[in-house]
Curated annotation (Swiss-Prot):
Its EC number is 3.2.1.8. GO terms for biological process: xylan catabolic process. InterPro entries: ConA-like_dom_sf (IPR013320), GH11/12 (IPR013319), GH11_AS_1 (IPR018208), GH11_AS_2 (IPR033119), GH11_dom (IPR033123), Glyco_hydro_11 (IPR001137). The keyword Cytoplasm does not apply. The keyword Chloroplast does not apply. The lineage of its organism: Eukaryota, Fungi, Dikarya, Ascomycota, Pezizomycotina. This is Endo-1,4-beta-xylanase. It is an enzyme of class 3 (hydrolase). Residues 1-190 form the GH11 domain. Belongs to the glycosyl hydrolase 11 (cellulase G) family. Keywords: Carbohydrate metabolism, Glycosidase, Hydrolase, Polysaccharide degradation, Xylan degradation. GO terms for molecular function: endo-1,4-beta-xylanase activity.
Length: 190
């Protein structure tokens, strides 16, 4: 089922699809935890499937194809409240490393790769509570992949060791994000 921006449930999984109003995106919910997204000449969008709420110890499995042209990420993506945090465990990305310009805080080895840990800040930007100022936490995988398993606790514990704490978990999805780029992805989450 091809849908417009919004959130809801599809075949037992939570989905979230957001765009900035300038994104040429087609997002489709498939069976189970599957979804597809195609985009071209897009603005900014984030779309994917997972859980609401997420947890701090979930092992997330994902598989499929991811073919970006330009600035795009394939991530475990979510939010917490109190504190308001947007977080990414980046498994793959296109031409732009999302950590560019950020200060590296450390690294963690998990699920067959080293991930570099960063924190960035967003000022007066969209969030799950409306326009707000908040931190973003990042783990960026060095060995890119489009299928695998992610032990989220390894990342959250590593972040906490650097003072990056999460609050009450909100949604947690496997997400494709694009920023003024094009591409296609077909992902299944479990």
């Amino acid at each position: 089922q091809t849908i417009g921006p919004g959130t809801g449930y599809s075949n037992g999984y939570y989905y979230s699809y957001w765009n900035d109003g300038h994104a040429g995106v087609t997002y489709t919910n498939g069976g189970g935890g599957s979804f597809t997204v195609n985009w071209s000449n897009s603005g900014n969008f984030v779309a994917g499937k997972g859980w609401q709420p997420g947890t701090k110890n979930k092992v997330i499995n994902f598989s499929g194809s991811y073919n970006p042209n330009g600035n795009s990420y394939l991530s475990i993506y979510g939010w917490s409240r109190n504190p308001l945090i947007e977080y990414y465990i980046v498994e793959n990305f296109g031409t732009y490393n999302p950590s560019t310009g950020a200060t590296k805080l450390g690294e963690v080895t998990s699920d067959g790769s080293v991930y570099d840990i960063y924190r960035t800040q967003r000022v007066n930007q969209p969030s799950i509570i409306g326009t707000a100022t908040f931190y973003q936490y990042w783990s960026v995988r060095r060995n890119h992949r489009s299928s695998g398993s992610v032990n989220t606790a390894n990342h959250f514990n590593a972040w906490a060791s650097h003072g990056l704490t999460l609050g009450t978990m909100d949604y947690q999805i496997v997400a494709v994000e694009g920023y003024f780029s094009s591409g296609s992805a077909s992902i299944t989450v479990s």
